Amino acid sequence: MLSNNIDEEFYYNISKYKTFNEEKFLEYYLESKSLTKPINYIYLLNKINYPHFLSFNENPYLAITNPIILVNPKFYLGDDYIPKNLILVNQFDHIKRDNEMQISNEIVDAYQRLVDFIYLNNQQLIIYSAYRSYNYQKTLYKSDNPYTAKPGHSEHQTGLAIDISNFYYGLSSNLSSSELFKLLSTNAHHFGFILRYPESKEKLTGYPFEPWHYRYVGEDISKIIYQEDLCLEEYFYKYVLLTY
């Protein structure tokens, strides 16, 4: 089957991955010729095994949860999914709101550091929306509102997503032209957060640009996403070996 040493080396490298499919070897090999070197074998496998990953014309699948959660119009959380270690937002300095909003304890320290950074730059930061249960999202959902996700398809159900702004702009599109947005969009990755629905990535995320919506993914991942100008879907396609 293999004609030369280059083929043998390619076969050896790609066959080590658990999603390698012997029957698709020729497809892998031919596609590899269009990729820059060194070959990203994870991306190559994903591209051939899951050619429609970055589109939303398939039936939905349960959310991918490893290494982090991916929720979008294609991947959903069940109605019984409740993140562990939810805590009240109003317990923490700089984050106080007079309501019962909750966030995952996983993001509290990182968010506190982000808020401190914003305050040092003479800006304020307020959480407008955090964790939402499946049932609460059900009450919010309106099929004709592109900013409202279907129940199970909202990142807010993870407890890792927050809508943040200041009192002046709130959750308005005008936030994108503000000094606060400039600070957030160019520095949030230092604290493990990403702008989840960036401008010009709407077809990949499945949602319109939201300058207020940030998602915690951890500093290692957030820095890659920022440096390579990726959205979370592109990160998964490029760096996470898909199995769904």
Residue ranges, per PLM feature:
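Extracytoplasmic cell-surface/polysaccharide-interacting catalytic and binding patches
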Residues: M1-A130, Y134-Y244
